[in-house]
A protein has these predicted regions:
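Conserved SAM-binding loop of SAM-dependent methyltransferases across substrates and taxa
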Residues: 140-151
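A short glycine-rich, Lys/Arg-flanked "PGG" loop and its adjoining helix->strand segment in the class I
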Residues: 213-228
């Protein structure tokens, strides 16, 4: 067995205390090896730099936290020099893509205003009170904190990008809540037919999958009977037989495979075994929701759209539209 990466030891200890379900306990035995491979400095050459940034976070105590505000917030007293140290350490984890966050007055203005998406979906989903929740492709965990703020008993986010895991750890360092986790895993690394979660979220993942039906069935297998799937993905206009396959890039992304119409997406979900399928929202992404900032200085949505017509991508395809669909496991 490989050694557990130091930043993930507390997660395993928390699972050991809480998990009684047989399938989860079996998964727990696999985690040290999974985490060691996912957080390998041999595979990810920037990991030492990111870990140094995490280690440089100053010691501060939050007197108030807010998981329900637009920005996940921790407040408390801090000297000016300490705040400079805090900001320097956090900027060492650039680029910050999903948020926003506010730590002791240091505002992390992320590329995405992820609160916009939460505001669109939260009124339409099953209440999260006392639920075990999975967030697939969670990034740095912004929505995981919102799920906890909505009353979830336990939230597990998974994302294979080590930087996002360490960004989450930076926020967790000050929020100090041990029932929210971001693990360095892809959905395919979870045990098959886990059937352990009351609600599973998959947002911004499906269009990156070469086999969308396989992704939907993998999501289905994470859910306990009666559990709810909350799915968000790129869509195009059309009927239930409309699916757009970008010939090359889409909005400068080379890893976009299938963009269904909402009706086609719901047809796929029925094929994958879901019931009670509801279209919650369709929204064209705006440059107010996704843009470059001081905390994410690379290209963003304004660079991916036709400068003369924001209804088209630079390649001439329909501009990004995102649908939110809920469904249930019988």
């Amino acid at each position: 067995m490989l050694d557990t990466p130091p930043e993930l030891i507390a997660d395993i200890e928390a699972f050991q205390r809480r998990w009684e379900d047989r399938a989860l306990r079996d998964w727990l035995q696999q985690m040290p090896d999974q985490f060691s491979l996912s957080m390998s400095e041999t595979r990810f050459g920037d990991l030492p730099r990111w870990r140094a940034a995490l280690a440089a976070l100053p010691s501060l105590k939050a007197e108030m936290i807010d998981l329900d505000a637009s920005a996940i917030t921790a407040l408390g007293p801090a000297a000016e020099q300490v705040l400079l140290e805090l900001e320097t350490a956090l900027r060492g984890l650039h680029p910050w893509r999903k948020g926003p966050f506010s730590l002791f007055g240091v505002d992390i203005d992320t590329e995405w205003r992820s609160d916009f998406k939460w505001d669109r979906l939260s009124p339409a989903i099953d209440p999260l009170e006392d639920r075990r929740v999975l967030d697939v492709g969670c990034g740095s965990g912004y929505h995981c904190w919102r799920m906890k703020g909505a009353g979830a008993r336990e939230v597990i986010g998974i994302d294979p990008t080590p930087l996002f895991v360490l960004q989450f750890k930076a926020i967790q360092h000050y929020l100090n809540i041990d029932s929210v986790h971001v693990l360095p895993l892809a959905l395919e690394q979870l045990p098959p037919k886990l059937k352990a979660f009351d609600t599973t979220f998959s947002m911004g993942v499906l269009y990156h999958r070469r086999s969308p039906i396989d992704h939907l069935t993998d999501l289905r297998d994470t859910l306990a009977p009666g559990g709810q799937l909350v799915l968000e993905t790129l869509v195009v206009e059309g009927d239930e037989d409309t699916v757009f396959v970008p010939p090359e890039r889409y909005a400068r992304m080379g890893n976009v495979w299938f963009l269904p119409s909402p009706a086609a997406l719901m047809k796929w979900m029925r094929k994958a075994g879901f019931t009670d399928i509801q279209l919650v929202d369709v929204n064209q992404t705006t440059v107010a929701e996704q843009r470059s900032t001081d905390w994410m200085t690379f290209y963003s949505l304004p660079n991916f759209l036709d400068s003369a017509d924001h209804n088209k991508t630079v390649e001439g395809h329909p501009a990004p539209r995102r649908a939110i669909v809920t469904a249930r496991l019988p």
